[in-house]
Amino acid sequence: MRPVALASERAGLHSIAIADSPLISRELFLSCAECLHETKSLNVMTAVTNPLTRHPSVAASAIATLCEMAPGRLLVGIATGDSAAWGAGLRPAKVSVLSDYIIALKQLLRGEVATWQGHEFSLHWDGYDPSLAPPIYVACAGPRVLRMAVEVADGIIPAMGYAPQNIAHVKQLVADACVEFERDIHEFAISWYAEFTFGESAEEVLKSHLGADSQWLVMGSTEGKLIPPEYIPLLKEMHADGHNLEVAYKDRERGEKLVQRAKSLGLYDWLYARASRLCGTPAEIGARLQSFQEQGLDHWCLWQDG
């Protein structure tokens, strides 16, 4: 991670995001520590951890240690659990479990007594400064997790589509939840998630990349995701083999296969319309980002594909 972190800092990026999928990548918090140690101003985000593979006391200890190492430079991203969960035979956490976990983390990091699964505990560190507690962002692909995040977290990382109706949907969900939970919408952060892929042209890249993580459309509930009902079984068919680490992460032809499946199932045009399509030359990606900025999307969590 060191070369990536140093290059990111030289390029002037705000943050580097590090995945938490222990069967396919190096340990999350050790990687965060390396990146923080080797840089001076770069922020580091866990993108994203989960409430399943670490007890909240373990996660809080790691997070607090990193915050002491590099005050103000850690961001915590969390979700219900993707490859870290299903790769180890676990199901994603229920929304209520994720909510309770975030609450417990925040309590511990504020130096308070936390409650988790019927047990109470707290940090007993000498000299711990609760003001170092980092913001917590929740990655979400649907309205239930988004609503919960507005209640208990500091921001979201939505992957809910980029057609105009998708963007409007996310903004309205956030606005409604801020009213419901009496949050100041101007203090709630949105860091939009999308893939980006460099290539000779956007047209060329899109032959082998969908430009979107369509598997999350059918992870968990499909309610409120703006999916035409007739597409739900087709999307499940398209991603039937997706919970296999070799298939999902090691097959170099995976993107092209998904494009062909989408076309054969009659899903391609719909998926294309809702995709971020951040692909092609730097100029093409920059122009696309500029068009999103004009719609008020000015903070991103980007995953480089390919």
Where are the regions that the model predicts?
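Active-site mouth loops of central-metabolism enzymes
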Residues: M1, A47-P56, P130-A141, F196-G199, ...
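Hydrophobic faces of well-ordered beta-strands that scaffold small-molecule active sites
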Residues: I16-I18, N43-A47, L74-I78, I136-A139, ...
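An alpha-helical appendage that flanks or caps ligand/catalytic pockets
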Residues: R91-G127, I167-S291
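N-terminal beta1-alpha1-beta2 module of alpha/beta enzyme domains
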Residues: M1-T46, P134
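Acidic-and-aromatic substrate-binding clefts and catalytic sites of carbohydrate-active enzymes
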Residues: D20-E27, P51-S57, A163-A168, T197-F198, ...
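Short, acidic/polar
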Residues: M1-A7, A62, C140-M148, T281-S291
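Alpha-helix-loop-beta-strand connector modules within alpha/beta enzyme cores
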Residues: F29-T49, T53, A104, L108, ...
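Acidic (Asp/Glu)-rich catalytic clusters
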Residues: L6-R10, C32-N43, I63-L74, V150-E151, ...
